[in-house]
Amino acid sequence: MKYKFRNVVLGGTFDTLHSGHVKLLATATLIGDRILIGLTSDSFASTYKQYKVRPFSVRLANLRNLMSLIAPEREVAYVEIHDPYGPAVFDPRLEAIVASIETAPRALQINDERAKRGLRPMEVFIISTVRDGYGHTLSSTYIRRVLERPESKQS
């Protein structure tokens, strides 16, 4: 199968995997032959998350398992990122970036950084938000908060 782009990138913390992550990852597999996923390091995640995320090794294993279900035939590379940009700002092979509405500004910043380095901008694909049955935006943080509510705990 011929895909629109040879090399597609996306990134995130991927702590508690949910359908929003599936949508993001599936979009990348629909448009790209090779997928590069930037996964935040534990130290970088601790700078912007208000809670302790799962260890990098656990998040990576979960992400690999999910990608093997979404696109088992696809070539996927994983890279640990220590800043908001990762290799997206310096890898000239990257042609497209997939982002959520929440992370779209970061994708545009990445393209600005690429331009400063003399690299062509990537095409930006923005996916819509996934909501739960009550209209709340799904995120790892939201899921964690719901699970921590006293009424959520089973005795």
UniProtKB/Swiss-Prot annotation:
Enzyme class, first EC level, given as a word: transferase
Pfam families, sorted: CTP_transf_like (PF01467)
EC number: 2.7.7.3
Catalytic activity: (R)-4'-phosphopantetheine + ATP + H(+) = 3'-dephospho-CoA + diphosphate
Keyword ATP-binding: yes
Compartment(s): Cytoplasm
Gene3D superfamilies the record matches: HUPs
GO terms classed as biological process: coenzyme A biosynthetic process
GO MF: ATP binding; dephospho-CoA kinase activity; pantetheine-phosphate adenylyltransferase activity
Superkingdom in the source lineage: Archaea
Family to which the UniProt record says this protein belongs: Belongs to the eukaryotic CoaD family.
NCBIfam families membership: cyt_tran_rel, PRK00777.1
HAMAP family referenced in this protein's UniProt entry, alphabetically: PPAT_arch (MF_00647)
Protein name in the entry: Phosphopantetheine adenylyltransferase
Organism per entry: Pyrobaculum aerophilum (strain ATCC 51768 / DSM 7523 / JCM 9630 / CIP 104966 / NBRC 100827 / IM2)
